[in-house]
C-alpha cells in the first residue's frame, strides 16, 4: 500500500535530504502553494510536485493508488520513450524520465518515484483557447500532432490518454511534448493489460480495459 496524500504532504515539508534517496536532488526545493504547503498536481495514480533546482526544474511523481505492476511497466515505457527521443533528435515528444524503485522515504518506508524533466509550454487546451482565431498557429499544432502520431504508429505505441492537459505546446505551435505515461502502450507491456482507459471525455465511449494496443 502506498502513502496517502496527507502523508506525502507531511513528508515533503521536511528537508528533502531526509526523504529523497537520490543525492542529486537534496539541494532542490518543492514548489509551494499560496498557503505555504507543497503544491500538488494530481493524476489517476500519482501526485506530481515541482522540484526546483538551481539550473532546471524536475517533476516528482509519487504514487498514492495503483492496481498495476509499476516497476516492470515503467521500466519498459522509459526504454521506448528514451529510444524515440534519441531517434527524433530536436523534436522530442517525451520528457526525459527515470524510475527509482526506492526513491522516497515516508514514515520510515521506501516507495517508488518517477523523476521527469519539467517541460515548458502551454497545455494544448490553453494553447487552443488563446490562439483559436490564429489560423497559422492552429495549423502548426495540427501538423505537429500529425507528425507525432505518424511516429507513434510507425513504432507501434500509443499514449493512451490524449487529452488537452497531457499535451504541452510551444508558443509557435510547432513543437509538442506528451506527459503522463501511466496509460501508455508499447508491445513489451501488452501482457500487463491496460492500467487505465484515459479521460472519459476524450476517449471513444466503448473503450474498455480490454482494448490495449497501439490504436
Annotate each predicted stretch with a short phrase.
Residues 153-170:
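Catalytic-loop of the protein kinase fold
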Residues 36-38, 44-95, 107:
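ATP-binding glycine-rich loop module of kinase domains
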Residues 1-39, 72-80:
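Juxta-kinase regulatory segment immediately upstream of eukaryotic protein kinase catalytic domains
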Residues 192-207:
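Conserved activation segment of eukaryotic-like protein kinases, specifically the C-terminal portion
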Amino acid at each position: 500500500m502506498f502513502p496517502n496524500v496527507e502523508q506525502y504532504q507531511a513528508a515533503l515539508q521536511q528537508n528533502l535530504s531526509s526523504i529523497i534517496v537520490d543525492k542529486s536532488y537534496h539541494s532542490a526545493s518543492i514548489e509551494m502553494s499560496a498557503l505555504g504547503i507543497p503544491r500538488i498536481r494530481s493524476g489517476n495514480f500519482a501526485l506530481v510536485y515541482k522540484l526546483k533546482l538551481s539550473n532546471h526544474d524536475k517533476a516528482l511523481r509519487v504514487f498514492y493508488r495503483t492496481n498495476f505492476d509499476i516497476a516492470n511497466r515503467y521500466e519498459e515505457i522509459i526504454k521506448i520513450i528514451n529510444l524515440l527521443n534519441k531517434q527524433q533528435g530536436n523534436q522530442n515528444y517525451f520528457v526525459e524520465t527515470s524510475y527509482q524503485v526506492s526513491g522516497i522515504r515516508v514514515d520510515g518506508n521506501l516507495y517508488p518515484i518517477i523523476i521527469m524533466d519539467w517541460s515548458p509550454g502551454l497545455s494544448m487546451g490553453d494553447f487552443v483557447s488563446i490562439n483559436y482565431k490564429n489560423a497559422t498557429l492552429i495549423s502548426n499544432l495540427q501538423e505537429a500532432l500529425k507528425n507525432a502520431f505518424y511516429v507513434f504508429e510507425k513504432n507501434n505505441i500509443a499514449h493512451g490518454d490524449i487529452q488537452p492537459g497531457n499535451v504541452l505546446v510551444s508558443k509557435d505551435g510547432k513543437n509538442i511534448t506528451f506527459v503522463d505515461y501511466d496509460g501508455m502502450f508499447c508491445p513489451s507491456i501488452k501482457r500487463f493489460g491496460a492500467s487505465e482507459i484515459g479521460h472519459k471525455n476524450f476517449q471513444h465511449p466503448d473503450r474498455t480495459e480490454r482494448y490495449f494496443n497501439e490504436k
